[in-house]
Design a protein with these regions (language model features):
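Active-site glycine-rich loops that stabilize anionic/oxyanionic intermediates
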Residues: 2-7, 162
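Primarily recognizes the serine-hydrolase "nucleophile elbow" in alpha/beta-hydrolase
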Residues: 49-124, 140
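Active-site nucleophile elbow and catalytic-triad environment of alpha/beta-hydrolase enzymes
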Residues: 94-98, 132-154
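A fold-wide structural signal in alpha/beta-hydrolase
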Residues: 22-32, 69, 107
Length: 166
């Protein structure tokens, strides 16, 4: 999932990254998810639908369903992490007509993700994601994904370096 502050999806975090994975023998899929004016949970549902599609077509595409790993950059990291922490939410499976296990990622690589909606938030990303709901403190807190981690969250490699200006 490329980043872009939920306003766009970055080209530099899409095909160049996928090509590196392909060169190493991995499958790679780029999700160009919906951004502003789209609102939560549309992008999350699109990512969940993509994971379910890959699981459904695993034999056809020669995918090891034990190794479906999400990678997301910046706001795309928030999106990937969202599926990682929310995959068991019933609204996802019900909306897509699948089981929760079909949308569960096996792991995540979160690359300088937008994670917190608290003190150190990249507020622009959350304003674009939530729209008018940004003013609802409970909805902002729900999107502060460091508060949503549970025993059901897949294993995660998370990395940051310098400030990400989105």
């Amino acid at each position: 999932c490329p980043g872009g502050g939920y306003t766009m999806t970055s080209d530099r975090e899409a095909e160049p990254i996928a090509m590196q994975y392909l060169a190493k023998g991995y499958h790679a899929v780029i999700l160009r998810y919906s951004v502003e004016p789209a609102r939560y949970p549309l992008a999350l549902l699109q990512l969940a639908k993509t994971v379910a599609f890959l699981r459904k077509h695993a034999e056809e595409f020669h995918i090891n369903t034990d190794k479906i790993i999400l990678q997301g950059f910046s706001a795309g990291g928030h999106l990937a992490a969202s599926l990682g922490v929310f995959w068991k939410k019933s609204f996802i499976a019900e909306t897509l007509g699948v089981t929760s296990e079909m949308v569960k990622p096996n792991g995540m690589i979160l690359s300088y993700p937008v994670i917190t909606s608290g003190e150190f938030a990249h507020t622009g990303s959350f304003e674009c994601l939530l729209g008018d709901d940004y003013n609802d403190a409970d909805k902002r807190k729900e999107q502060s994904l460091e508060l949503q981690v549970s025993a059901d969250t897949p294993q995660t490699f998370l990395w940051h370096t310098v400030t990400d200006d989105c």
